[in-house]
Amino acid sequence: MTNIRKTHPLLKIVNHSLIDLPAPSNISAWWNFGSLLGLCLMIQILTGLFLAMHYTSDTATAFSSVTHICRDVNYGWLIRYLHANGASMFFICLYMHVGRGIYYGSYTYLETWNIGIILLFAVMATAFMGYVLPWGQMSFWGATVITNLLSAIPYIGTTLVEWIWGGFSVDKATLTRFFAFHFILPFIIAALVMIHLLFLHETGSNNPSGIPWDSDKIPFHPYYTIKDLLGFLVLILLLMLLVLFSPDLLGDPDNYTPANPLNTPPHIKPEWYFLFAYAILRSIPNKLGGVLALVMSILILAIIPFLHMSKQRSMMFRPISQVLFWILIADLLTLTWIGGQPVEHPFITIGQVASILYFSIILILMPLASLIENKILKW
């Protein structure tokens, strides 16, 4: 008798995706982040569902409802902080996952890569709208500033912003629709994840060497299921350390003040995971130019596969590209720091230099390094 997992229509899909899946024998811990992102998404959907049971999306009661969750609901504080810090863990895993893709040349799987970029945009949109929901000072002013950026679009900009707001300012209509979108988007993300995996399983996983490893594949279970479980434990440990010891470490104190349209906070800034893009936005004195740079800072990922000039897929054996890659990481950390600083000297100049360096490394220096490395191969 054949095993049920190989014959049952539903279990067969699970079997081919998680049990009998042939996987390269040499994939490192950098390949753990895909499953960790799946775990993060599940944590966010579950905690979000329980928060939605007690939250009210009305400007008059939104802030109070969050306070009520933290004070009166059984373990409400835990659910709320798991959700808030879970988002931070989500983005840490996301950025590491993307970084892994760039380093090891996984972007050559075009369909998987492009769905990944769409996923990144969807997660960023979800996180932004979620930040607005507690209706604190930074929620309100963050929503005002970021949605206002769309007014830079020629001709239709102002109309578009008012259409998104549902009025002439960020108000009740905005909060209600943001809650609706924030609730539905994670399920759309989950569907996109399925497509992401579908495309990945068409080609199979990449590996650190970047060389096809078909001659030496091992079953996903038990080898990588155990490895993923270890990753889960580490992620949950780090998340619980954050939630139970310093839940407000990554948040903004201004968000503990109820939203007040008449009082602007001295420094309006988004959550830490958007600061690098925010720094790029601020480094350009022109509004439309800034918005274009902001969008391009993420959309540039879609251009990376077409800038791959190297004869090797992975950066594992490409020292010049490796140095540039780590300079890029340092540059992103610098941008993250600058995004949280006030707009004054010397931060303006540092931000502009870091922004130019960011685009230069990806668009010019990395392709050049690849060509030089190709030449070195012939020596």
From Swiss-Prot:
Residue stretches spanning the membrane: 33-53, 77-98, 113-133, 178-198, 226-246, 288-308, 320-340, 347-367
UniProtKB keywords: Electron transport, Heme, Iron, Membrane, Metal-binding, Mitochondrion, Mitochondrion inner membrane, Respiratory chain, Transmembrane, Transmembrane helix, Transport, Ubiquinone
Gene3D superfamilies: Cytochrome Bc1 Complex, Chain C
Binding positions for heme b b566 per the UniProt entry: H97, H196
Cofactor(s) named in the record: heme b
Binding site for a ubiquinone: H201
GO cellular component: mitochondrial inner membrane; respiratory chain complex III
Top-rank taxon, per record: Eukaryota
Residues the record lists as binding heme b b562: H83, H182
Gene Ontology MF terms in the entry: metal ion binding; ubiquinol-cytochrome-c reductase activity
Biological process annotations from GO: mitochondrial electron transport, ubiquinol to cytochrome c
Keyword Transport: yes
Membrane association type: Multi-pass membrane protein
Annotated localization: Mitochondrion inner membrane
InterPro entries linked to this entry: Cyt_b/b6_C (IPR005798), Cyt_b/b6_C_sf (IPR036150), Cyt_b/b6_N (IPR005797), Cytb/b6-like_sf (IPR027387), Cytochrome_b (IPR030689), Cytochrome_b_C_euk/bac (IPR048260), Cytochrome_b_N_euk/bac (IPR048259), Di-haem_cyt_TM (IPR016174)
Main location: mitochondrion
The keyword Hydrolase appears for this protein: no
Note accompanying the cofactor annotation: Binds 2 heme b groups non-covalently.
Pfam families: Cytochrom_B_C, Cytochrome_B
Family note: Belongs to the cytochrome b family.
Subunit structure: The cytochrome bc1 complex contains 11 subunits: 3 respiratory subunits (MT-CYB, CYC1 and UQCRFS1), 2 core proteins (UQCRC1 and UQCRC2) and 6 low-molecular weight proteins (UQCRH/QCR6, UQCRB/QCR7, UQCRQ/QCR8, UQCR10/QCR9, UQCR11/QCR10 and a cleavage product of UQCRFS1). This cytochrome bc1 complex then forms a dimer.
Role of this protein: Component of the ubiquinol-cytochrome c reductase complex (complex III or cytochrome b-c1 complex) that is part of the mitochondrial respiratory chain. The b-c1 complex mediates electron transfer from ubiquinol to cytochrome c. Contributes to the generation of a proton gradient across the mitochondrial membrane that is then used for ATP synthesis.
More info: Heme 1 (or BL or b562) is low-potential and absorbs at about 562 nm, and heme 2 (or BH or b566) is high-potential and absorbs at about 566 nm.
Protein name per the record: Cytochrome b
Biological source species: Lepus mandshuricus
